């Protein structure tokens, strides 16, 4: 009875799945997608469908394979130790690139928060410093987990907030005028932005890693993974597209802190700075968690 009471239900697992994905991947996307235009909403829809399919595949893998190690364990179940190595090696390489991107995002928001103008060399040096600082401050799973569970709110509050209240400042004509500002061929524009939107779903692969802690995992894990992925997709699509109707395309494309810029347009510079501070906090917490994952 006590063992069952310690397990989490489908609603809790769904929320956890969304939180796992809503790290720092979203915070620079409005800027990157503004370079393509609001036509990127098509890429969001394609990516959401693909990510949902991947999430379901991972959920099913977790049901068939009880090996530990996430994707490596799943690969070993079918392809042996060579499969385990290839899965973990390629995943590790992707995380190295991901962590660098997170650190760059933190530096970008931090420079905007402090009103500093950084050269490319300065950005590189501050990025290296941020990566090493996160490495040094990794004190283990428990402390890192507590820090990450707190700092994640730095991105959840602005992203969910703008998805709900941002419509008050949304300008439909601005959104339409930003559809394809550089007149890039449709399929080329969609293809380029898909590689960006897929980044926001980093973390879905870890959503079903601990099925032992879930009530009725055969039923609840697939529901939670699919529900969490779809929920995150809705928030991502709404938030990035609302911003495109609040901030002019050229200004958004040149910003290093798009969410802070959007809140500054909605309210004032002070609120914008607060949002930038929350985003820096979230980036660093996310970086701590992913550095621990690599280790």
What are these regions (language model features)?
Residues 31-35, 53-130, 134-138, 143, ...:
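Hydrophobic transmembrane alpha-helices that form the core helical bundles
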Residues 1-31, 35-39, 51-59, 68, ...:
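Membrane-interface "cap" regions at the ends of multi-pass membrane proteins
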Residues 20, 24, 28, 43, ...:
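Hydrophobic alpha-helical transmembrane segments in multi-pass membrane proteins
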Residues 39-40, 150-154, 211-244:
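Junctions where cytoplasmic loops transition into the N-terminal start of transmembrane alpha-helices
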Residues 31-32, 77, 135, 190, ...:
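Helix-loop junctions at the membrane interface of multi-pass solute transporters
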Residues 73-76, 80, 112-116, 226-288:
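TM-loop-TM module centered on a large, flexible mid-protein loop between adjacent transmembrane helices
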Residues 29-35, 108-116, 170-183, 249-257:
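Membrane-interface helix termini and inter-helical loops of multi-pass transporters
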């Amino acid at each position: 009875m006590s063992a069952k009471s310690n397990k989490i239900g489908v609603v809790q697992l769904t929320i956890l799945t969304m939180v796992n994905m809503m790290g720092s991947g979203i915070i620079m996307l409005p800027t990157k997608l503004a370079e393509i235009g609001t036509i990127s909403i098509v890429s969001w829809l394609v990516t959401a469908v693909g990510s949902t399919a991947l999430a379901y595949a991972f959920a099913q893998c977790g049901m068939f394979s009880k090996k530990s190690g996430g994707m490596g364990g799943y690969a070993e179940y079918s392809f042996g130790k060579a499969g385990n190595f290839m899965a973990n090696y390629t995943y590790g390489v992707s995380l190295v690139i991901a962590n660098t991107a997170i650190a760059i995002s933190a530096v970008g928001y931090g420079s905007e928060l402090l009103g500093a103008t950084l050269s490319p060399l300065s950005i590189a040096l501050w990025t290296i410093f941020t990566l090493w600082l996160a490495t040094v401050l990794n004190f283990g799973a428990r402390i890192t987990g507590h820090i990450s569970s707190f700092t994640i709110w730095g991105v959840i509050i602005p992203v969910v907030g703008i998805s709900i209240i941002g419509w008050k400042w949304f300008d439909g004509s601005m959104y339409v005028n930003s559809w394809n500002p550089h007149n890039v061929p449709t399929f080329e524009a969609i293809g380029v932005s898909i590689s960006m939107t897929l980044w926001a779903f980093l973390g879905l692969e870890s959503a079903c890693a601990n099925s032992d802690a879930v009530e009725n995992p055969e039923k609840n894990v697939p529901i939670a993974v699919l529900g969490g992925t779809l929920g995150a997709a809705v928030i991502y699509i709404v938030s990035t597209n609302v911003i495109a109707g609040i901030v002019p395309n050229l200004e958004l494309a040149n910003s290093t802190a798009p969410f802070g810029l959007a809140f500054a347009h909605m309210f004032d510079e002070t609120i914008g700075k607060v949002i930038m501070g929350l985003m820096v906090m979230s980036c660093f917490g996310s970086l701590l968690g992913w550095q621990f994952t690599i280790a």
